[in-house]
Every structure is written in C-alpha cells, then in structure tokens.
Amino acid sequence: MTKEHSEQQKDLRIRSKVISEGVSRTPNRAYLRALGFEDEDFQKPMIGVASTWSEVTPCNMHIDGLARASKQGISEAGASPLIFNTITVSDGISMGTDGMRFSLPSREIIADSIESVVSAENLDALVAIGGCDKNMPGCMIGIARLNLPAVFVYGGTILPGKLDGKDLDAVSAFEGVGQYNNGEIDKEALHKVECAACPGAGACGGMFTANTMSSAIEAMGMSLPGSASHPAVSTNKSKDSRAAGKAVYKLLEKGIYPKDIMTKEAFENAITVVMALGGSTNAILHLLAIAHTIEVDLTLDDFEKIRKRVPHIADLRPSGKYVMAHLDEVGGIPAVMKLLHDKGLIHGDCLTVTGKTVAENLEQQPDLTDNKSIIDFDNPKHATGPLVILKGNLAPEGAVAKISGLSVTYIKGPARVFDSESKATKAILNDEIKPGDVVVIRYAGPKGAPGMPEMLSASSILVGKGLGESVALLTDGRFSGGSHGLVIGHAAPESQVGGPMALLEENDTITIDAEKLEISFDVSDEELERRNKQWQAPPLKANRGTLAKYAKLVSSASKGAITD
C-alpha cells in the first residue's frame, strides 16, 4: 500500500468519532442532522471555523464572508465544516473611554470561547479568523490550548483613507484632536479627517497591533504565506480563507499540530519580523502569552537579545510613511522574510501550516519589488530593533519602549503623576504639560485598571501638540500600535500590587535612557521605604463581572498578562 493510499484510508475523526459512531450517540447525531448532516458527513472529520464577524468594528464587518469561504475550502477538501462565532471589541471605538478596559480581557474571552466550543463539540481541527487587535492573540491562545491541527486567517488591513491627495489612517484622527487643540487646524478640517480616515472594511492600516500580529503569526508559520498583508477588500483575502480550509485538512491528514509549528525558533522568527517592521509593543505582551500557552519558554530577555541583532528596516506608520497595503504591493511578509532569511536572521527549518518549512516556502518567493522606499536593509531606520526592554528601580520586572522614528531616546525630568488617562489627557489639553516633563499614568495595569487599557488618546494628543519628542509618557498600562513618541508602557510590577510607580510623587526626577536600557527615579532607599510603609493598595475598580474575574486571575505584564 502506498503512503498516499494509506493517508486516504486513515480515519481523520480524531475527536468527532465519539459522536459520529455508536447507537448511544443517536441523539447527538440527531442535532447535527438538523444542521443538514447526511450519513456520509459523519464519516468525515468535523472542522470548526471560528469567526469573529461583527458589526461593531470595521475590522470585522466582512469576516462572515471569509468564514464562508473557509467553509467552502473545508468542504472541497473532504471534511464537514461548522462555523461558530466568538466576540470582538473595537479598540478604536472604545479608546479613551472606560470601555477600553475590556480590550485586553477580550483576548482571554476569545481564547476561552474557542477552547470551549471546539472541546464541547469534539471538533477535529480549526480555522480561526480574526480582524481587530485582540482577535489574533485570542485565536492563537485558543489554538495553542487545543493543540489540534489549525490555521489562522487574518481578516486583512484597511486601505488608506484619502484627503487632499494625502493618505490617512485611524491615528490621523487621534492626532488631529491634538492639532485642533493646538490651533493648527480648525473644526471643519478635523471633521474632514474624521470622515476620510477609515474608508471601509479592515483593521487599522499602519504597522499597528493588528498588522503586527498578523505578520508575527505568518512568520511563526501559523498562517498561509502572503496572507498577513492582503487588504481586507482584496479578492486575495477570500482566496486566503478558502485555501486555509484546504490547508487545515492537509494538516489533519499529515498529523501536524500547533506544537510542531510553534517552537522556540518559530517565536524567534516572529520577533525578528516584528523588530524589522517596527511593530507594536503589544506584540511583546501577546507573544509571551501565546508562548506560555504552547509551553515555550519565552521571556522579555529573548526580545532584547533579538532586538540587538535585527535592524529596523521598514518605513511604516505610525512613525513612518507607508501602510500595510503598500507593503503588500511590493511582496508582503514573504518577501520581507526572504530578505531576512538571506541575511541569516530567520530560522529556515521551522515547519509551517503549508506542511513545508519556512525555507521551502521562500524558495519560489520573488524578491521585494520595492525600490527601497518602504524596506531598506542597507540603510535601516535604526541599526537595531525599535522595541526596547527597559529595567531599573522604576520597573524591576521590565517596561517596554518603542523608539522608532525618534531622534531623542533619553529624557530626565519631573514626574507629572496621574491616576487615570482622562486626568492626564485633560492636563495635556489644558497646556499644563511642558517640554521635559514625564507624564505618568498609573493604576492602569492588568489588575489596576483592570484590563490594562491603551493610552492612544494621551499619546496622540501629545504628538498632535508637537510634544512627542520632548515629553515622555510612562504607564503600567499599554499603548496602541498606533502610538508613537517617547512612550513607555507595561511597567512591571504594576502600581496596583505595590510596584515602584505607586510610590512616585509629583516632581520626582525620572530618568529614561533607551540606549542604556534603563528606567529609574531619583529617590533614596530611605525615602522609598518610608513611602512604602505609608502606601496602601486601593480597592479594585471592579467587584463583579468580567473585569472583577479578570483582575483576580491576571498575571504581570512581564509574563504576558495571562490568566491561567
């Protein structure tokens, strides 16, 4: 018997067989017959399609069609597909409001729900489709928990908005608020930006969190080559989804599981691509969480080790000129990976969802067609990666800074301390913040907020007011992938558990040195001891529901803000 014939005969119902066969499972099958199952369908593996379709965000408004394309691909491959939904929240719409506290917890809800449905229904494999920021890590954590054959599909990037011949993105609207407050544009001009920034379906267009994570997942080998950069409205995106349905069936046939793909070296490939592209600080948090789930030993030190050897080569927003759709036009993530592989920065022997290795996937990949305007390895934006891990007496477990596009990587100035983003934003808009200040937003961590919200409103207004390189912004919360300027987040331990930020007082001198990888404040040990004795943890800001449960379970940001 040939190997091919043997594979065809292999029973791929690795879990669903407990429902598909046996007299005692007659009632179970009756429910599936209501869905249209016939006798022959029970002889096939059952493959789930986890859809994050929703009308609460443009990132996900089109995903139902992609889920149906994946369903078609699964059927054509010879399996029985079942679509189910999970949630999404819109980071952009909730930004700057209390709703932003639910963004990071939604990552866990997505993972929990995917794990729950696939486990309860005894599905054999999975295609997961995500659009907005937390969809990607949520789907990947769910995939890692299940360790069943799986392919991730990214819903795709939005196209750039157009106004007066210039490209816009969602961050243009956030920064426009600062420009309006500073008197640089009037209300009519701001309204035009609002109306033009987001032209249709897809996730935020720059190298923000969604595009960063889609790139990381493709580099890790868990998405089909090229799919990370295809725009949401392109015909390629539907093709990606259909192909994913066929690919997951092949993984099931070959017995290839996420643990076979998501190795330490695969995570190193993901980090390498994130550093080269100048990706979001959120990638650090999410990759730590995914690695924990798949039982790969990944720490902040691994990010710093890779950062030192990988140049930042992409001129992408938020600090650069171009968006993901432009990168797609010149070859996308495969072309970037081929360049990095040729330079010896990528592990080529890692397995991927194609069933081939990274190197095998890249063999037929054309080189970048860019004239070095978007990607330039020989003249990088920075000789090392832009996501810097800082440590010191203000963040003993670490903090994350993004230095892309900055001419200033050092600041020493007085702390301007706020216990909420809204208070800090009000002070910025009222011109109470001056060049040289270090704005501190604390009690914004995983437990303290709870939910570790992003500070895009505050950071964007600073940039819009021309203070992006003269005022630092420090928090135990997060920053959007759209944030730029001198921003430092993820400070750990967080304030809520008595981290050093909780002991800061107005006008304490803070030193941030991205070159020396240091973050500290000039307060004597004796004074710190006195403050520590007086400090009391404030009551948690949620005592029931989603946020209360999250606050009780969540770990430090330095561990990925995991909940298990």
Curated annotation (Swiss-Prot):
Annotated active site: 480
Catalytic activity: (2R)-2,3-dihydroxy-3-methylbutanoate = 3-methyl-2-oxobutanoate + H2O; (2R,3R)-2,3-dihydroxy-3-methylpentanoate = (S)-3-methyl-2-oxopentanoate + H2O
InterPro entries for this protein: DHAD_IlvD/Edd, Dihydro-acid_dehy_C, DihydroxyA_deHydtase, DiOHA_6PGluconate_deHydtase_CS, ILV_EDD_C, ILV_EDD_N, IlvD/EDD_N
Cofactor: [2Fe-2S] cluster; Mg(2+)
Binding site for [2Fe-2S] cluster: 59, 132, 204
Subunit and partners: Homodimer.
Record-given protein name: Dihydroxy-acid dehydratase 2
Annotated source species: Staphylococcus saprophyticus subsp. saprophyticus (strain ATCC 15305 / DSM 20229 / NCIMB 8711 / NCTC 7292 / S-41)
Taxonomic lineage of the native organism: Bacteria, Bacillati, Bacillota, Bacilli, Bacillales
